[in-house]
A protein has these predicted regions:
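Polytopic transmembrane helical bundles with strong interfacial aromatic enrichment
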Residues: 1-241
């Protein structure tokens, strides 16, 4: 069943499908990020301990979440690529890795900015921070490995294997605050019965998270479509566009 489903995802079909989704994804991202940042920066009250410094949460938390979400996409696409050797998923793997690296860097950068007034330093070798930094290195290694081969298919296969092995870091990042004594607090949002964050602060975070997620989807599809055009430039269907 899965094989027949994936085999129908041809480069040509993916190109036209992504072309329809990309504008909507970016439109949703602009609306939700804009509204979320407006609420977070101008409407939400100051934190009683951190003051206005906490407001960076509306960029930091979505970035950290998407750094893991993007790697999950890399992992799934890598498995599909290795089993069924479908070009579209090879391209989706590297596109997800590129954008995942971007959000990982953004999470680390905003975390450093947030950490300076809170912890008194830009960086500590905290378990969560260290494992997130390792994630950035894994992303970069996947990208470099992919482009180190003249043959796209060989590069994709090598990158897929590394991506699957590197997935072990994802649960380490997620559970690091429970397994080790870290400066990072435990979950404060993903406790749906009683979130420990005030609703006035929570809703803007939900909006920006949805917005950044929509941006990630659009960016992955756009990057994939551009790579697809390069790889398929000598095919008839590209000439007919």
């Amino acid at each position: 069943m899965f094989k027949s489903l994936f085999e129908n995802i041809s480069p040509k079909n993916f190109y036209y499908f992504s072309s329809k989704i990309i504008p909507w994804a970016f439109l949703i991202s602009i609306i939700f990020i804009g509204y979320g940042l407006y609420l977070g920066l101008f409407v939400a009250p100051s934190d009683y301990q951190q003051g206005d410094a906490f407001r960076i949460i509306y960029v930091h938390v979505p970035s950290a979440w998407l750094s893991l979400f993007a790697y999950s996409a890399v992992f799934i696409c890598s498995i599909i690529s290795l089993i069924w050797k479908i070009k579209v998923f090879e391209i989706l793997t590297i596109a997800s890795a590129k954008n995942g690296a971007l959000f990982t860097f953004l999470a680390l950068a905003t975390g450093a900015i947030w950490g300076k007034p809170m912890w008194g330093t830009w960086w500590v070798w905290d378990a969560r921070l260290t494992s997130e930094l390792i994630l950035l290195f894994i992303y970069l290694a996947i990208i470099l490995l992919y482009y180190s081969f003249d043959d796209y298919r060989k590069g994709a296969k090598a990158a897929n294997i590394l991506a699957i092995v590197g997935f072990i870091n994802i649960p380490i990042i997620h559970f690091s605050v429970e397994w080790w004594n870290t400066l990072h607090q435990g979950p404060s949002v993903m406790k749906f019965s009683s979130p420990s964050i005030a609703s006035e602060m929570l809703y803007p975070l939900i909006y920006t998270t949805v917005g950044f997620t929509a941006y990630l989807v659009g960016a992955i599809l756009l990057s994939s479509r551009n790579d697809l055009i390069i790889r398929e430039k000598n095919t008839n269907w590209i000439s007919s566009i």
